[in-house]
Amino acid sequence: MMEKSKPNVVFVLGGPGSGKGTQCANIVRDFGWVHLSAGDLLRQEQQSGSKDGEMIATMIKNGEIVPSIVTVKLLKNAIDANQGKNFLVDGFPRNEENNNSWEENMKDFVDTKFVLFFDCPEEVMTQRLLKRGESSGRSDDNIESIKKRFNTFNVQTKLVIDHYNKFDKVKIIPANRDVNEVYNDVENLFKSMGF
């Protein structure tokens, strides 16, 4: 019997407001991948009223990173629920501990291909987020939370990107452009990788 091939995973990283969600939606539409947003999974869990939910709520509001094992468990459940698919994991791993937990718990189940990094200047992201905050109703689209999220990204998430860079597994996309120009690069990258 042939061994079932492991699903491919691409980590989608970039500062808050760099356009990760928008670009993931395009990849889903054109390549049939499943988009797993760590933040969305955590927000759903928070609303489910589980015991993890309350802790998650407090941490998100404070711009803190939820314990890795909680997020990895939610991601693994979502991957198990979508057999035979490839996955975009958006907004994770946010720090080295996240990444270590992912590698310990997931390396036998998935093939982590590369990090898709949307590189965008902070002032551009801030403008986008404040605009989104007018309509999104997200508790973290305000200037205080935004500053904390940039800090988390600059201090912690960049170390994850450096880690994957050592293995030549980071694809950088300049994201301070028209959304269609950005996607053009993404689409060409995915085609060149044989997806």
Swiss-Prot record:
Residue numbers binding CMP: 98
GO annotations of cellular component type: cytoplasm; nucleus
Region (NMP): 37-66
Enzyme Commission number(s) of this protein: 2.7.4.14
GO molecular function annotations of the record: (d)CMP kinase activity; ATP binding; CMP kinase activity; dCMP kinase activity; magnesium ion binding; phosphotransferase activity, phosphate group as acceptor; UMP kinase activity
Source organism, top-level taxon: Eukaryota
Binding site residues for ATP: 17-22, 132, 177
Subcellular location: Cytoplasm; Nucleus
Entry keywords, A to Z: ATP-binding, Cytoplasm, Kinase, Nucleotide-binding, Nucleus, Pyrimidine biosynthesis, Transferase
Main location, first listed in the record: cytoplasm
Residues annotated for a ribonucleoside 5'-phosphate binding in this entry: 43, 64-66, 91-94, 138, 149
Cleaved signal peptide residues: none
Coiled coil: none
Family annotation (Gene3D superfamilies): P-loop containing nucleotide triphosphate hydrolases
Cofactor(s) required for function per UniProt: Mg(2+)
Cofactor stoichiometry and binding remark: Binds 1 Mg(2+) ion per monomer. The Mg(2+) ion binds to water and substrates.
Swiss-Prot/TrEMBL catalytic activity: CMP + ATP = CDP + ADP; dCMP + ATP = dCDP + ADP; UMP + ATP = UDP + ADP
Class of the enzyme per the UniProt entry, highest EC level: transferase
CDD domains linked to this entry: ADK
GO biological process: 'de novo' pyrimidine nucleobase biosynthetic process; CDP biosynthetic process; nucleotide salvage; pyrimidine nucleobase salvage; UDP biosynthetic process
Annotated PANTHER family: NUCLEOTIDE KINASE
Family, per entry: Belongs to the adenylate kinase family. UMP-CMP kinase subfamily.
Role according to the record: Catalyzes the phosphorylation of pyrimidine nucleoside monophosphates at the expense of ATP. Plays an important role in de novo pyrimidine nucleotide biosynthesis. Has preference for UMP and CMP as phosphate acceptors.
Subunit structure: Monomer.
Classification via HAMAP family: Adenylate_kinase_Adk, Adenylate_kinase_UMP_CMP_kin
Protein name, entry field: UMP-CMP kinase
Source organism (scientific name): Dictyostelium discoideum
Gene symbol of the encoding locus: pyrK
